[in-house]
Amino acid sequence: YTFLTGRYASSSHSKIFLKECPAGTQALPAFNVGLESDRMNVGRVLEDAGYATGFVGKYHVHDTDHSKEGSLFGDLDVPKNAKYSDQLNKRKFKLEKLQRELVKKNGFTWAKNIYWGNLKSPFKGHNPDWTAQAALEFIEEHKDQPFYLHCCSTLLHGPNGEWFKSMMEKELVTGEGFLKKPLNLIDRKSVWERIQKAGLTEAEVGYLWMDDSLGLILDKLDEL
């Protein structure tokens, strides 16, 4: 929130935050701050300055009270620990497309491959390939004009054990449900081999995995 708006999180005036922490009371910012309806954030400001502004990856800053999405569409994400079904997977896919539009409504000109919040079963699993794929697409589409890309990796969030489990077992899970085939943008086997060669453990794979995903984006920028 602070990086997107330049405001201290405790200065948020989003409705969801003020409902929990009314003005004049002790502020406790956590999962209760969202981008305000004034759209005063880096995406909107740079858009006004002529930039294409893209958002990929983890969002988790939607103010659910400043619009009617909840009443129109129900929950904006699938319930935690819901039983997997093909129908649920299709709903996850459709919700991610709605989430893209909500991110754009809040100030960005382009959004894709969105994680709405924290990872939740049955779609719990990191997939930096999926985030990087959207980042590369945005850069390619806007390489001939000024652009700003906000890329948020889920790998910044633990627990560490989930990094290794995701890397070895969950190459199909994404923020839009399960893919039909892996993206294979990052060599996961190589990540694990280099971690072991460095004398590190499963608990550290997320750092190198994230580094490789960011490397894809930096390499793309170097090509321009």
Regions from the PLM with identified roles:
Residues 54-56, 62-64, 72, 148-152:
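Outer-envelope exported proteins of Gram-negative bacteria
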Residues 1-41, 45-55, 64-66, 110:
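Active-site segment of extracytoplasmic enzymes that catalyze sulfate/phosphate-ester chemistry
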Residues 87-106, 110-224:
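Active-site-proximal cap/lid insertion segments
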Residues 1, 12-17, 64-70, 121-124, ...:
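Short, solvent-exposed loop/turn and secondary-structure capping segments
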